[in-house]
């Protein structure tokens, strides 16, 4: 098990590293060369600044029972398809019961924006998001530990 962070624009990294350290779980952060990320705990891997470069590196380096942290539903779907677990930086767990709906809603929002419509953005990150991320990341790590034993 390792934690893989889609690092371009990932809030909550301090919480993720705190939980990772607590459980001695290796953390990999993938980001483009345009995002300078420094960490005393996580291994930062820089990738080219191409379209969806980080997404493809995350997907290609994810294996069964890894935990992927991403706000991208497509990356989450690829991780789930490989037998990994996925969670958003706000602490929402992606699973096989909700990923299809989330992808469909994303499609509808994109279609609406292309037609000139507006879509509502995310709310400002708050303590509830931090608490949810901490708690649900703990849940996922314990789930993987239970599967592995």
From Swiss-Prot:
Top-level taxon: Bacteria
The record ties this protein, via Pfam families, to: DUF188
Family, similarity comment: Belongs to the UPF0178 family.
User: Could you tell me which HAMAP family the record lists for this protein?
Assistant: UPF0178 (MF_00489)
Which NCBIfam families does this chain map to? PRK00124.1
Name this polypeptide is given: UPF0178 protein CPR_2251
Q: Which organism is it from?
A: Clostridium perfringens (strain SM101 / Type A)
Taxonomy of origin reads: Bacteria, Bacillati, Bacillota, Clostridia, Eubacteriales
